[in-house]
Amino acid sequence: DTTESRGLGDVYKRQMYDAPGIGLAAIQVGVPKRIIVMDISKEEGKKEPRYFVNPVIKNKDSIKSTYEEGCLSVPNQFAEIDRPSKCEVEYLDYHGKKQLLKADGLLATCIQHEMDHLEGVLFIDYLSKLKKSMIIKKLSKLKSNTAVL
């Protein structure tokens, strides 16, 4: 339902901006829906949110690009990740209209990163076992050092 997806998208958009982050998948906030919001605009004060409902990647480039990625689900941890430099994604937009977007650069990376969440994959899953275990240890240590009052 477009109205429900739009309302949920607006909530996720606020959560993404509050975090702050450039993308958020519904599943990251415990909602098992295939909805993604993102905003990679760099201009201060100019927001350009994008909504992707039921996104499907139709094509990925064989050429890779590397970006340092972080994630609201893996706080304060960052790593360089190789992903296809371009992708085509089909989705329903904010108004429920079917769209096909050819993305490259940071937008392509962000789409793939957020779509990974829909499949239960985190950016740290692309790392070597050693790097991934180091990040998990850091997160566990942070969690155990955080007192709940």
Segments predicted by a language model, with ranges:
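Ala/Thr-enriched low-complexity intrinsically disordered regions
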Residues: 2-3
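Active-site rim/adjacent substrate-binding subdomains
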Residues: 6-112, 117-149
